């Protein structure tokens, strides 16, 4: 089936690298700058790099926030990437503005007592806690690339689908509920493993986007 994919452009995103990755998968996308651009879109990607409060301010300036809330409440397909994952939650310790609140929980600073350098930059393996459209059945093959100083703590443990090691602790790597999900790492910068994740997501969309339990 033909898939109309929207990439949200709000001045905080790694748009070019995501676009190039999608091109390699033979999938085009439309940039979403305002609510009019949502017409005819089947699924959205919310990318992001930077800080929480400026990101929410930029999203509000586009007028997209109420439309994204309705999109999530209607359980339409949405994929957050990096900061895009954090914006799906209710609040962040990085700022004072509320997030979108499509997923319950809070974003907290990575633990300094872990002994690891912050920001966390580099490759890490995934530990699966459930299934979702991004993940393969072979967790050992999934090393992915992270750049972040904060991580989400979901209220509902069932929303956590994968974590990654940070020092002696595990931090959130993938969250998913229904058709709304996100990854803290950058799949578009995670070589073959990340590309295969996006390919699985696109296949899931084309096959009808069955909600994830």
From Swiss-Prot:
- Cite the active-site annotation: 82 (nucleophile), 186, 188
Where in the cell?
Cytoplasm
Determine the domain of life of the protein's source: Bacteria
Pathway per the UniProt entry: Amino-acid biosynthesis; L-histidine biosynthesis; L-histidine from 5-phospho-alpha-D-ribose 1-diphosphate: step 5/9
GO terms, molecular function: glutaminase activity; imidazoleglycerol-phosphate synthase activity; lyase activity
> Which InterPro entries does this UniProt record tie to the protein?
Class_I_gatase-like, GATASE, Imidazole-glycPsynth_HisH
Q: Which UniProt keywords apply?
A: Amino-acid biosynthesis, Cytoplasm, Glutamine amidotransferase, Histidine biosynthesis, Hydrolase, Lyase
Q: Does the keyword Manganese apply?
A: no
Give the UniProt record's GO annotations in the biological process aspect. Answer: L-histidine biosynthetic process
Q: What is its EC number?
A: 4.3.2.10, 3.5.1.2
Question: Glutamine amidotransferase type-1 domain spans which residues?
Answer: 4-211
Cellular component, GO, one term: cytoplasm
What the protein does comes down to:
IGPS catalyzes the conversion of PRFAR and glutamine to IGP, AICAR and glutamate. The HisH subunit catalyzes the hydrolysis of glutamine to glutamate and ammonia as part of the synthesis of IGP and AICAR. The resulting ammonia molecule is channeled to the active site of HisF.
Recorded hits in HAMAP family, A to Z, give: HisH (MF_00278)
- Name recorded for this polypeptide: Imidazole glycerol phosphate synthase subunit HisH
Taxonomic lineage is: Bacteria, Bacillati, Cyanobacteriota, Cyanophyceae, Synechococcales
Name of the gene this protein is made from: hisH
